[in-house]
């Protein structure tokens, strides 16, 4: 099974619409063939319209950084997956450790969001990852496997084949620390084996698994050389056109 690599920028709470348009203008003609690498930017909700308009006709896919699990209703401040689909968005990040930590999102919330995202014809990027304390206690596999089982509960094999799982050890996000390529591969392999146990070998071979946590041009090639790492979820290094282009064109 040949899985198309996917490099996704997660802009977090950075960039305004003007900066977004300038960024896309700088990268849109230099992106790799989408059959070789899928190039994705996940932007704040206030930038999505500018991103969509600027990226029109290019190889750049567009993602949101979060959504709610209801399409509409009295949910002040939330983002509708239905409206994201109507806007032409492709992916939605859910379960990021910053959402789990700062906004107290639970595994149940993330599972509901995954179902709502699929119900609206979008694709989730489901984040998982352990704290430094969990790793030092050598309980990282149990922790991440538990997150995966909870997030995928009730999803079909076909749905799981079409989603992306992003392994982001919390201790490596924005810290400059990176899991070694062997540590990252070990956990991504465990995630794939978990999908196989929950579904079947075909589903496990189809699902794409990213590594996230201080991914940058200097380490992307080594990470992407590992058999179970299919992409990167990139924070700070995705904010500058030059470094983003180095990341998505890592095969050159």
UniProtKB/Swiss-Prot annotation:
It comes from the Bacteria. It is found in: Cytoplasm. The active site is at residues 96, 168. Pathway: Carbohydrate biosynthesis; gluconeogenesis; Carbohydrate degradation; glycolysis; D-glyceraldehyde 3-phosphate from glycerone phosphate: step 1/1. One of its GO terms (molecular function) is triose-phosphate isomerase activity. GO terms for biological process: gluconeogenesis; glyceraldehyde-3-phosphate biosynthetic process; glycerol catabolic process; glycolytic process. Its main location: cytoplasm. Substrate binds at residues 10-12, 174, 214, 235-236. It catalyses: D-glyceraldehyde 3-phosphate = dihydroxyacetone phosphate. GO terms for cellular component: cytosol. Disulfide bonds: none annotated. InterPro entries: Aldolase_TIM, TIM_sf, TrioseP_Isoase_bac/euk, Triosephosphate_isomerase, Triosephosphate_isomerase_AS. Keywords: Cytoplasm, Gluconeogenesis, Glycolysis, Isomerase. CDD domains: TIM (cd00311). Its EC number is 5.3.1.1. Homodimer. Belongs to the triosephosphate isomerase family. Involved in the gluconeogenesis. Catalyzes stereospecifically the conversion of dihydroxyacetone phosphate (DHAP) to D-glyceraldehyde-3-phosphate (G3P). This is Triosephosphate isomerase. It comes from Lactobacillus helveticus (strain DPC 4571). The gene is tpiA.
């Amino acid at each position: 099974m040949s899985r198309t690599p996917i490099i996704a920028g997660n802009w977090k709470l950075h960039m305004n619409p003007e900066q977004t348009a300038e960024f896309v203008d700088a990268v849109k003609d230099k992106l790799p063939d989408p059959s070789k690498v899928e190039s994705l930017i996940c932007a704040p909700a206030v930038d999505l319209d500018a991103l969509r308009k600027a990226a029109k006709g290019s190889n750049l896919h567009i993602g949101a950084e979060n959504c709610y699990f209801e399409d509409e209703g009295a949910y002040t401040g939330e983002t509708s997956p239905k409206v994201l689909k109507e806007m032409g968005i492709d992916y939605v990040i859910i379960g990021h450790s910053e959402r789990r930590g700062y906004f107290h999102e639970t595994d149940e919330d993330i599972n509901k969001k995954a179902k709502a995202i699929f119900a609206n014809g979008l694709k989730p990027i489901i984040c998982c990852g352990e704290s430094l304390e969990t790793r030092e206690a050598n309980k990282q596999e149990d922790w991440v496997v538990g997150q995966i089982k909870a997030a995928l509960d009730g999803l079909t094999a076909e749905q799981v084949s079409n989603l992306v799982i992003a392994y982001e050890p919390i201790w490596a996000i924005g810290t400059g620390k990176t899991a070694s390529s062997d540590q990252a591969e070990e956990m991504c392999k465990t995630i794939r084996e978990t999908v196989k146990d929950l579904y079947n070998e075909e589903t496990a071979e189809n699902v794409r698994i990213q590594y996230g946590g201080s991914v940058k041009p200097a380490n992307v090639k080594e990470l992407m050389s590992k058999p179970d790492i299919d992409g990167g979820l990139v924070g700070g290094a995705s904010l500058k056109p030059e470094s983003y282009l180095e990341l998505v064109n890592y095969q050159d």
